[in-house]
Amino acid sequence: MGYRKLGRTSDQRKAMLRDLATSLIVNERIETTEARAKELRKIVEKLITLGKRGDLHARRQAATVLRRVEILNEDETTQFAIQKLFTDIAPRYTERQGGYTRTMKVGPRRGDGSEMVIIELV
């Protein structure tokens, strides 16, 4: 099986994964279901690899996935999620060849018993 359908149509699934990828880049740690985290991991690994490349084409490819979200930094300046990926996150992993994310099981969700995990950047 190449991918999970996650109970959605293709455009809904793509939009959800874009939102999750942007949230993970901005917050560096999110809680989601296990199936979503496994699909999200594929996308984020590719984004960080693009960030490590750092050229204009890689930046444009990453911009097709990430949403245009402004982030307020500690020093009162703002930057976009794409800038954070290329300036803050990608330089951390110059020596690492893949494996940029970690998932930790949290337990079942109270409402429907779905297995929840925390996915974070290593």
UniProtKB/Swiss-Prot annotation:
Domain of life: Bacteria
Gene Ontology MF: a single term: structural constituent of ribosome
Listed GO CC annotations: cytosolic large ribosomal subunit
InterPro entries listed in its UniProt record: Ribosomal_bL17, Ribosomal_bL17_CS, Ribosomal_bL17_sf
Biological process according to GO: translation
Database matches in Gene3D superfamilies: Ribosomal protein L17
Alphabetical UniProt keywords: Ribonucleoprotein, Ribosomal protein
Matching NCBIfam families: L17
Similarity remark: Belongs to the bacterial ribosomal protein bL17 family.
Quaternary structure annotation from Swiss-Prot or TrEMBL: Part of the 50S ribosomal subunit. Contacts protein L32.
Designated name of the protein: Large ribosomal subunit protein bL17
